[in-house]
Amino acid sequence: MEEFQRYLELDRSQQHYFLYPLIFQEYIYXXAHDHGLNRNRSILLENAGYDNKFSLLIVKRLITRMYQYQQNHLILSTNDSNQNLFLRRNKNLYSQMISEGFAVIVEIPFSLQLISSLESKGIVKSHNLRSIHSIFPFLEDKISHFIYVLEILIPYPVHLEILVQTLRYWVKDASSLHLLRFFLHEYCNWNTPNKAGSSFSKRNQRLFFFLYNSHLCEYESIFIFLRNQSSHLRSTSSGTLLERIYFYGKIKYLVKVFVKAFQVNLLLLKDPFMHYVRYQGKSILASKGTPFLMKKWTYYFVNLWQCHFYLWSQPGRICINQLYNHSLDLLGYLSSARLNPSMVRGQMLENSFLIDNAINKFDTIVPIIPLIGSLAKAKFCNVLGHPISKAVWTDLSDSDIIDRFGRICRNLSHYHSGSSQKKSLYRIKYILRLSCARTLARKHKSTVRAFLKRLGSGLLEEFFTAEEQVLYLTLPRASSASQRLYRRRIWYLDIICINDLANHE
């Protein structure tokens, strides 16, 4: 218990971060603006006009009003709505600008902590580990040999004040936290968290993602403590992001509950063959243990949510499944581990015998129904998968239309290159090709057949993916061995964000 408390009571001398003055610096908004341009470039290219909302004049006007009203504390109080001109003029635009600037500022101490932690531990930064595809080789090597999998939908805080309380353990600048509460109170109605919170998160994505990730980090740090049965909560992969200041005081009740059960119950949770994976709000816990062990983990997760995060666990949040007859819906793939039987014939002197051997094989396929639903939502086809024309693109030139369709097709092919079965991917390519042809035919007021006959079938050569061209150079198609390599799954280490159409969650 003393070791546990010693870790939780971290050194406070390194936690003096005064971030509030940075909110008045122009370069902060310029950095947030550049980040927003890079992050909001969708493959559908339908978010033009983002740059028109931000200008140096608007930033200067915003900072002037913040200086003007900060002495009267009107930026932190909304009691007198008649005098608070800051809130009344350009309310949504100013809130979005300040929230994005605040998100850049509050990430500074975390970046400094992470860099210092990596330097002290001698860890070399590997950009390949940032790739989304890097998780699948791990699943193929580890989880395919396991028996049970625990699928967990991490509950989201009903009240956004829980997110502020979590951030309070990391940032000791009271003014910055008051500013954050001001935004959450003014632009999110506390009485209707679902509707207002959704609107707030869409307008202020970077700040919302930061708050949610800090919430997940708090949740996972306690889970690591239970997993390792130790007071040492630090993780090599997460670095100092798992360190907090006021952790012990907040979970005093939770500690009392767990300490009483450590000597008996946690012994039942000891399982060296256990792996944990998380993406977005879903986590997976795989084990070679028994169903009783998985039920014990379910019990501890429910108590963790209720005692520490004040969240009531809803039915169906945690599901226990056997891996060999269940598929994991993760990162736009349906992943499963199936037995691949093989027969080996052996001969010893005059006696021959057959050995039946079954090997677990990790299988990944593209879920065709959700992907068609995403295409239908983007107006490339109907709900049945029949291609339709993209009417909003008919004003573009022919080369721009082909370039946009080709870019979407290449991105999907690049992201789903790890699929074990290519039929679903070929169907998606067919839908996009025919949708492109229908769009061009609609623009020229012609039929698809007449349009392709007039211009030739080579018009849609843009749809040949870059991966195929690379494979032609690296894997010659002459030998049968190279053909087997060509059909294998390929995981790329340069994918740092999930494809717009592949994100069905």
Curated annotation (Swiss-Prot):
The yes or no answer to whether the keyword Flavoprotein is present is no
What's a GO biological-process term for it? RNA splicing
- For the keyword RNA-binding, the answer is yes
Q: Name one GO molecular function term.
A: RNA binding
Q: Which GO terms describe its cellular component?
A: chloroplast
A Pfam family per the record: MatK_N
Location comes to: Plastid, Chloroplast
Q: What is its main location?
A: plastid
Recite the UniProt keywords alphabetically: Chloroplast, mRNA processing, Plastid, RNA-binding, tRNA processing
Coiled coil location = none
What's the family? Belongs to the intron maturase 2 family. MatK subfamily.
Q: Quote the function comment for this protein.
A: Usually encoded in the trnK tRNA gene intron. Probably assists in splicing its own and other chloroplast group II introns.
- Protein's UniProt name: Maturase K
Q: Which organism is it from?
A: Hedera helix (English ivy)
Q: Which gene encodes it?
A: matK
